[in-house]
Amino acid sequence: MAEAGAGLSETVTETTVTVTTEPENRSLTIKLRKRKPEKKVEWTSDTVDNEHMGRRSSKCCCIYEKPRAFGESSTESDEEEEEGCGHTHCVRGHRKGRRRATLGPTPTTPPQPPDPSQPPPGPMQH
């Protein structure tokens, strides 16, 4: 029986596969752009076309509406804006914000000559 097993042969085949991948030489370029400013002039529907050229413009000093925080009511400051800045060019008829009487002489009051007994005004001090 020892002779029966001697005639068998076994073949072992080893296959080695070597896969070589070349590193990809890709490059990624990211370009940074400056943000566009969010500030811009927006005219409301009641802005006057005072030049009749199809463009909206305003010489009213109080047309600007300050941006409000989220949830802040837009009616809180409407009373002040509608009552006024006191300028004659203002088409909204504002009247409230007149400060000329407290700041000094009005344009209708002639300027007062300097008092000779007083020293001339010096440099402004802060």
From Swiss-Prot:
One of its GO terms (molecular function) is protein phosphatase inhibitor activity. Residues 1-25, 70-126 are annotated as: Disordered. Residues 10-22 have a biased composition (Low complexity). Widely expressed. Changing H52A: Loss of function in inducing TLR2 degradation. Auto-ubiquitinated. This is E3 ubiquitin-protein ligase PPP1R11.
